[in-house]
Regions:
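Flexible, polar/low-complexity N-terminal or interdomain linker segments that lie immediately upstream
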Residues: 1-40, 45-49, 123
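Short amphipathic alpha-helix with an adjacent loop that forms part of the alpha/beta core around
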Residues: 32-33, 66-75
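Short active-site oxyanion
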Residues: 36-41, 56-57, 77
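Conserved beta-strand scaffold positions in the cores of enzyme catalytic domains, especially
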Residues: 41, 58-60, 104-106
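Short loop/helix-cap segments at secondary-structure boundaries that form the rim of catalytic
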Residues: 50-56, 69-73, 114
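Short, hinge-like loop/turn segments at secondary-structure boundaries
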Residues: 59, 77, 121-123
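Glycine-rich, highly charged phosphate/nucleotide-binding loops
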Residues: 59-67
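Catalytic cysteine-centered active loop of the rhodanese-like fold, especially the PTP/DSP P-loop
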Residues: 72-115
Length: 123
């Protein structure tokens, strides 16, 4: 049985407000790409997986290259994604890049969610 704590609602409200401020979904990103909005899409998966398919226009920046900050921009939003919902590599990258002053969001669900939504895949 789940315990309910007083104050949980306020914590939950803050959590979801923060989550919405720093995550976006694949359909929204696809719309931004289609409208040629000024965003940078960063794929933090391994290079071999990036080559098999990725979000159109994405830049591959695997973990071993995070220190280079290659492709990141300070003047626009950098949208980070990894493999799937249970992959925390995107969140780790976003934290590291944000700590260095880059505006970041994470794509909810990773590349798996992109594919599940039937969106265009680049190779």
């Amino acid at each position: 049985m789940t315990k309910t704590f007083k104050g949980n609602a306020a914590r939950a409200k803050q959590f979801f407000a923060d989550k919405m401020a720093f995550t976006t979904g694949p359909v929204e990103i696809s719309r931004q790409i289609g409208k040629k909005e000024d965003v940078v899409i960063i794929d933090v998966r391994e290079s071999k997986d990036f080559k098999k398919g990725h979000v159109p226009g994405a830049i591959n920046l695997p973990q071993e290259k995070w220190d280079t900050l290659a492709g990141l921009r300070r003047d626009t939003m950098n949208i980070i994604y990894c493999y799937a919902q249970n992959c925390h590599m995107g969140a780790h990258a976003a934290m590291q890049f944000a700590a260095k002053g880059y505006p970041v969001m994470e794509m909810d669900g990773g590349f798996e969610s992109w594919k599940e939504n039937g969106l265009k895949i680049a190779k």
